[in-house]
């Protein structure tokens, strides 16, 4: 039962944090590139890598990794924004967003794991 509570607590704070960051960027970003989701997902990849790489206890992994990072990052919004770029025929931004998210996300997850293991 405590495990579910840790995940739920982390998830609550992760979702609220993502909501606040997304709204902040949407008010300031006037480009077609979905910068808020991109930065959230890249930051989340790095932090999750760091959490796992640092060897924290299972409780902290559940709270921060599964809960907070699971709600903070958003694969579904990434896919929705990608489809919206395609529907608007904004092919160059679509390709940039898609490739940058995957490539930079993997690199940042690796970097986080390396730094977490120091």
Curated annotation (Swiss-Prot):
Keyword entries, A-Z: Cell membrane, Ion channel, Ion transport, Membrane, Metal-binding, Sodium, Transmembrane, Transmembrane helix, Transport
Mode of membrane association: Multi-pass membrane protein
Domain of life: Bacteria
Species of the source: Bacillus cereus (strain ZK / E33L)
Regulation (activators, inhibitors): Na(+) is not transported, but it plays an essential structural role and its presence is essential for fluoride channel function.
Cell membrane is among the record's keywords: yes
Bilayer-spanning residue ranges: 1-21, 33-53, 55-75, 93-113
Matching InterPro entries: FluC
PANTHER family reported in the protein's UniProt record: FLUORIDE EXPORT PROTEIN 1-RELATED, FLUORIDE-SPECIFIC ION CHANNEL FLUC 2
Single annotated GO MF: metal ion binding
A Pfam family that the UniProt record links to this protein: CRCB
Main location (coarse class): membrane
One GO cellular component term: plasma membrane
Protein name (Swiss-Prot/TrEMBL): Fluoride-specific ion channel FluC 2
Any one of the GO BP annotations: cellular detoxification of fluoride
Residue sites binding Na(+) per the record: 70, 73
Role: Fluoride-specific ion channel. Important for reducing fluoride concentration in the cell, thus reducing its toxicity.
Subcellular location: Cell membrane
Family the entry assigns: Belongs to the fluoride channel Fluc/FEX (TC 1.A.43) family.
Reaction(s) catalysed (UniProt annotation): fluoride(in) = fluoride(out)
């Amino acid at each position: 039962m405590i495990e579910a509570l840790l995940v739920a607590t982390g998830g609550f704070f992760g979702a609220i944090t993502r909501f606040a960051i997304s709204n902040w960027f949407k008010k300031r970003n006037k480009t077609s590139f979905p910068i808020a989701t991109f930065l959230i997902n890249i930051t989340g990849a790095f932090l999750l890598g760091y959490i796992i790489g640092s060897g924290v206890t299972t409780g902290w992994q559940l709270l921060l990794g599964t809960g907070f990072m699971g709600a903070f990052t958003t694969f579904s919004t990434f896919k929705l924004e990608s489809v919206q770029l395609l529907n608007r025929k904004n092919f160059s931004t679509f390709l940039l967003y898609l490739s940058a998210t995957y490539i930079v996300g993997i690199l940042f997850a690796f970097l986080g794991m390396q730094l977490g293991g120091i």
